[in-house]
């Protein structure tokens, strides 16, 4: 009845848009990375590089956002503080500072970076010619790909015309 009264008087009914943001969807996402090179500088730091970086995880570099990472392919206790770095050859290409991982972490291991459900994909870029990653939804133990990984052809299509 109220809507009819508003329309009869030719008032516009306002529309409300909602942007869910980190508080709602942030915890719903996990980003998986494969470990590449590991560089241990005794007495300074241990760097664990992964197959992604600031092109798909920019919030640490932009805002100093903090994340937690877990080794997911083996059940071992975390006993060492490391820096998880991306592969983009930038000093700011850091995924997680002071990550707690097992000292046995090695090339080929998989790390899960938690709480990446908000903004990670929407802020992803092709910086350094990096392909945007795929996105999967999980429900009842089953994975469904909802966004395919960007192909090399898609990446360079505008550069080849």
Residue ranges of each PLM-predicted region?
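Short, small-residue-biased leader/transition segments that mark boundaries at the very start
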Residues: 1-6
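Charged (often Lys/Glu-rich) extended helix/loop segments that serve as interaction or gating elements
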Residues: 13-161
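Structural alpha-helical segments in enzyme catalytic/regulatory domains
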Residues: 7-11
């Amino acid at each position: 009845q109220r809507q009819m009264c508003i329309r009869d008087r030719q008032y516009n009914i306002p529309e409300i848009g909602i942007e869910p943001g980190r508080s709602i969807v942030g915890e719903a996402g996990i980003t998986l990375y494969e470990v590449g090179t590991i560089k241990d500088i005794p007495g300074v730091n241990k760097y664990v590089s992964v197959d992604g970086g600031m092109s798909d995880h920019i919030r640490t570099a932009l805002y100093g956002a903090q994340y937690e990472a877990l080794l997911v392919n083996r059940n071992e206790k975390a006993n060492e503080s490391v820096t998880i770095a991306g592969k983009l050859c930038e000093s700011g290409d850091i995924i997680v500072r002071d990550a707690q991982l097992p000292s046995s972490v090695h090339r080929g291991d998989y790390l899960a970076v938690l709480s990446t459900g908000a903004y990670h994909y929407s802020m992803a870029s092709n910086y350094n010619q990096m392909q945007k990653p795929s996105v999967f939804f999980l429900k009842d133990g089953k994975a469904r790909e909802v966004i395919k990984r960007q192909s090399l052809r898609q990446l360079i299509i505008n550069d080849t015309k």
